[in-house]
């Protein structure tokens, strides 16, 4: 587990607009090995596109129809030539337990492939664009 960040005032957290979105389509990013390009129904007429570094953990076709939690008010940015209009939230979890004969001081660090990434979602379907609070 990573070290916790310092506390922030509630006003800072209140500025983050978390919403539910439904994945309409997902495909490999044409210019990046680790990214998927997703089209989302976020409750707006135009929807949005988000690029997410989840290709290693998710098959694009398995994402279609899933509901995810997004940060809806991030400024759009270019990721390898594609616009990303938000961020999909996910948890990162180390795979497996440390070997019983491993170093006791935690000196051995797992590589980036030694983790799982799990998308945050809702336990039942809700309207796209619903606010998360």
Predicted segments, located by residue:
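Phosphate-backbone binding interfaces of nucleic-acid-interacting proteins
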Residues: 1-133
